[in-house]
Structures are given as structure tokens and as C-alpha cells.
Amino acid sequence: METQSEEQAVTKPADSGGEGGPPQVAGAQAARPEDRMTLLLRLRAQTKQQLLEYKSMVDANEEKTPEQIMQEKQIEAKIEELENEVEEAKTAFEMKKLALDSVLMDNMKQILNLNKLIMKSQQETWDLEEKLLDVRKKRLQLKQASERKLLEIQTEKNKQKDDLDSMENSDKIKAIQQNLETEIQITTVIQHVFQNLILGSKVNWAEDPALKETVLQLEKNLTMI
Amino acid sequence: MSALRPLDKLPGLNTATILLVGTEDALLQQLADSMLKADCTSELKVHLARSLPLPCSVNRPRIDLIVFVVNLHSKLSLQSVEESLCHLDAAFFLGKVAFLATGAGRDSHCSIHRNTVVKLAHTYRSPLLFCDLEIEDFRAAMAQRLVRLLQICAGHVPGVSALNLLSLMRGSENPSLEDL
């Protein structure tokens, strides 16, 4: 006797994008194509998995089941055999996975080492650049110091020149110069007077060496001294 | 009134369907509600039934997981479950069936011995889960677990299939089961 079985169905709509939460507001419009992408990728993975399951069922159904009616114990023995085979296949798979993982590990370790080397070299480069910068700074400082010194020398020179010029323009010098000029004029006049005296006296001054010397001396132009 | 077959229909896109079979309507409804509240990226469909076979008139999607709920307090539930199991296609027992025993917390009310359900699960080579569906927190945790199980059975998790999961779960079972 079969009882009338009741059936009720309850459903729940999916959260697109996979995050359980309130529905997205208008501000998240930019995120929707990405959600669609993730949804599509998820559907693709699901369909792949389901296809795999169907394929394996088809393959399993192609196997021939034994026609004879075997005893229960034999059936159980066969079941155990098959289970053992499955276990062996699984362990072989696990070993392969471990081997691959170890290779992967090696690669990762190498990558890590290389990264460390890169970081060290970068650090060294940084230090050298800093040193270069220091040397350049020092050179700049030295240049500036030498510039200052030269400037000082120039100002000193200029000052000296100015002093000299100012000195020349001072009144004392002028007075002395005036005096000198008057003296020179007086002496020149005296020279001319003596010259004319000696020449006027009509003496032969070439014969007497002392007289000759005096006359020649009188010829000296005092302004040239 | 034909037997349920696991792969006779094409799966719905992003949909996973679970069938809860048991005599305790209130418990099933509560469990269904907890499952629908759980976090899941796929669409969930929960069908409830008192016993198999299901009426053919209803157009239902492909069922990915069947959970038989046995209440340890009542012998009727165990009987009904055992009767329903005959109407199931053998292909279902490759990972798409699970047994859920409830009511083990209150030992004084238990009329079915724990070992009975254990033997039942062992005979059908299916996983057995224990949960007190009356307690809110346990129910929520079990609902989460069932949702994950359902996702794998529906093929939504790449790399793990129902059969794979079955052998994985069996590996962690108590080895003393073999003595039964």
C-alpha cells in the first residue's frame, strides 16, 4: 500500500555576484559587468564539472556487469577488490601531486632567492647614488667657497685702486704737485738764465771740461725727470 | 510512480535541488528554512516529501541530493525511510544520498538504537550525519553543511564530485564500522 506522498517545494533566488547581502544600489552600476563576468565564469566551471560527471556515468554504464548470479560473499569480495583499486589510484594520484608540489616549491624558493638578490643590489645602488650625491654636494660647496674668495680678492683690489685714486685726488698731493711744478719752473728759468749768461759772455765753453759739463747739465729738461 | 533516477534530466543553470524525506514535517520545514537562509552562490531549491515514491504529475527539476531524516524517537520514521529506499535508483547511492539522524541528544526518548541507523547507512554505503534539529544553532550549522554537500553533488564545485566526496567522507569514518 502506498501512501499519498505530499511534496512541497521552496525556492530561493540567487545573489548575483555571489555575495549574500542587500541588492546593489545605483551607485554600483560599474560593478555589474564584473558581476556578470564572475557569474559567467562560475557557470562555466559548473557546466564543466557537470559535463565531467555525465561523461563518467556514460563510461561507467558501458562496463558489462556479470551475467551470472554470484553468491553474496563473492560479490562482497569483488566490491572490496574494486575499492582497493580505487584506493591505489587515489594514492598514486596523491604521490604525483606531492612530486609536482615539491617541484613547485623549488621554483618558488628560487624565485624568493632571486628576489632577495634583486633587493640587495637595489640597496647597493641606492647607497652608491647617495655617495655620489654627497661628493657632488661637496664639490658645489668648494666651488662656492672659491667663488667667494675670488670675489673677496677682487673687492680688495678694487678697494686698493680706489684708495690709490682717492689718494691721488687728495688735496695734499695737489698742493705738493703745485709746489713741484713751481719749483721746476723756477729751476728751468734759472737754467735758461745761466745758459744765456754763459752764451752771452761769448766764452768758448767747449774747451773747458767743467764748463762743458755745466752747460750740458743745464740742457737737461727737468720736466722729463 | 517510477523510480527516481539521478541523471535523467539536464541540470538547471546555477541551480541545485535537494530533497528532504522524512515523517516529521515541522523539523523538515525548519531545516529547509535554515538552508535557504544559508550563504550560497547558487540558487537553492528545497523539496520536502514524507516518503517516496513521488507523484509523477509534478514537474520537478533534477534532484542532486536526497537526505533521509530519521527521528530516533519514533520507529515510524525509520520504517518509512526503509520503505522509501526501495523506490530509489541504485545510481543515487553513488554519493547523492545522505542519512540524517535527529534526536540523539535526548537519550531517554530514543526508541531506535544508534547502531541501527549506523548499520542502515553502512548497508547503503552512504554518509550518516547526526544533528539535533530542534536546537537552533545545531540546525543552522547542519544546514550550512548540507548546503556545501548539495553544491558538490550538483557539480557546482570544480574538482570535487559526489563520488569523490563519498570516498573522502568514508575515509574519515570510524574503522570499527567494519566489525558490524
UniProtKB/Swiss-Prot annotation, chain B:
One of its GO terms (cellular component) is nucleus. The lineage of its organism: Eukaryota, Metazoa, Chordata, Craniata, Vertebrata. Pfam families: CENP-M (PF11111). It is found in: Nucleus; Cytoplasm; Chromosome, Centromere, Kinetochore. This is Centromere protein M. InterPro entries: Centromere_Cenp-M (IPR020987), P-loop_NTPase (IPR027417). It comes from Bos taurus (Bovine). The gene is CENPM. Keywords: Centromere, Chromosome, Cytoplasm, Kinetochore, Nucleus. PANTHER family: CENTROMERE PROTEIN M. Component of the CENPA-NAC complex, at least composed of CENPA, CENPC, CENPH, CENPM, CENPN, CENPT and CENPU. The CENPA-NAC complex interacts with the CENPA-CAD complex, composed of CENPI, CENPK, CENPL, CENPO, CENPP, CENPQ, CENPR and CENPS. It comes from the Eukaryota.
